[in-house]
Amino acid sequence: MGFQENKMPEVKRQRPGTMRLVDATQYRLPLAGVVSILHRASGAMMFALLPLVIWLFDTSVTSEISFEVFRSAFGAGIGWVPGWFVKLAVLGLIWAYLHHFIAGVRHLWMDATHSVTKEFGRQSAVVTLVLSVLFTVALGAKLFGLY
């Protein structure tokens, strides 16, 4: 009894609750967090589109005629979807692949070298974003026929 009575009352601290999606705009993520979320989003996007990409690849290599139909989609479009929108969608898929690949290399590098500091995380996040955008612009210029 003596020990229990002398115990100080615990102070209840207000703990943060679970973050809801609608509250996401109130938080300011560091750049490394933004790159991490984009890495996950690009991976999810590629996973969701994988059946379509496999079907398109299979269709394009079936015959020369099917390849020409596939190729004409970039110029004339598909049904009511204009060709520039098809190119824009493909450009989004190109960005997703490049960003996911570069961010994956970043994560592997950090795991292999134990470079887990706030400064390295910020610097490597900047490099990841810059490289993925530069490579996407270069491939997008080729996709839209600029060179």
Report residues per predicted region.
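Membrane-embedded alpha-helical bundles that constitute the cytochrome b-like, heme-associated redox core
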Residues: M1-Y147
